[in-house]
């Protein structure tokens, strides 16, 4: 079920998005190759992901101008993955690779929504979500980061960010500890002072359609 048509723009909304399964599968293969220091294999998987992304865009976005803009945005993160593989394969953290895949997923949804006339902005969760020294979410600093971030953002009804990714006190990419989708989404919503979270499960980018299904909505007390 493609849910993008059901995403409304009459109220301000923050979409907390999982990495699409097709992309996550590719990211896992890249990470496995890097773990074994098989750089050539890792780069082949990066190229395979790039080819798939271009194919999906050709299927999804009919406007040539919009498609070219989407390709440009996504290729930036493909190149960053390739650079990580080439420059420091023994030092690269697979969470940095995961972060690139998550951003690419957000960009896919962003450009598809724009094609439907729904203006939006992609926010990198690592730019505002922080863990404290106790490895628990630092809500005070996260809220401050959001306030600063929003000052320079366009006034749009939809914001898209990534699920579970954040930064620790050492400015390293990491994952929010514990919890599940309800918790992660509610945490992000709390940072934005939202009153309700609508949860979606995300599938893949298959046959030119983003697969998402709305499961339920929850208040922060329920989460």
Predicted regions and their residues:
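Nucleotide/pyrophosphate-binding catalytic subdomain
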Residues: 1-223
């Amino acid at each position: 079920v493609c849910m993008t048509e059901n995403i409304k723009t009459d109220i301000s909304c923050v979409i907390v998005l999982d990495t699409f399964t097709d992309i996550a599968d590719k990211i896992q293969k890249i990470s496995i190759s890097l773990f074994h220091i098989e750089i050539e294999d890792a780069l082949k998987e990066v190229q395979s992901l790039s080819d798939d992304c271009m194919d999906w865009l050709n299927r999804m976005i009919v406007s040539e101008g919009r498609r070219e803009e989407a390709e440009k945005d996504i290729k930036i993160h493909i190149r960053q993955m390739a650079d990580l593989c080439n420059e420091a394969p023994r030092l690269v953290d697979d969470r940095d690779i995961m972060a690139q895949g998550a951003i690419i997923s957000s960009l896919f949804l962003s450009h598809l929504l724009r094609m439907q006339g729904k203006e939006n902005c992609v926010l990198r969760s690592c730019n505002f979500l922080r863990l404290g020294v106790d490895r628990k979410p630092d809500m005070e600093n996260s809220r401050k980061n959001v306030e600063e971030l929003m000052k320079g953002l366009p006034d749009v009804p939809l914001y898209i960010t990534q699920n579970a990714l954040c930064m620790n006190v050492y400015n390293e990419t990491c994952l929010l500890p514990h919890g599940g989708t309800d918790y992660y989404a509610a945490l992000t919503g709390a940072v934005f002072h939202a009153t309700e979270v609508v949860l979606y499960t995300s599938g893949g980018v298959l046959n030119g359609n983003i697969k998402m299904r709305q499961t339920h909505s929850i208040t922060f007390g329920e989460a």
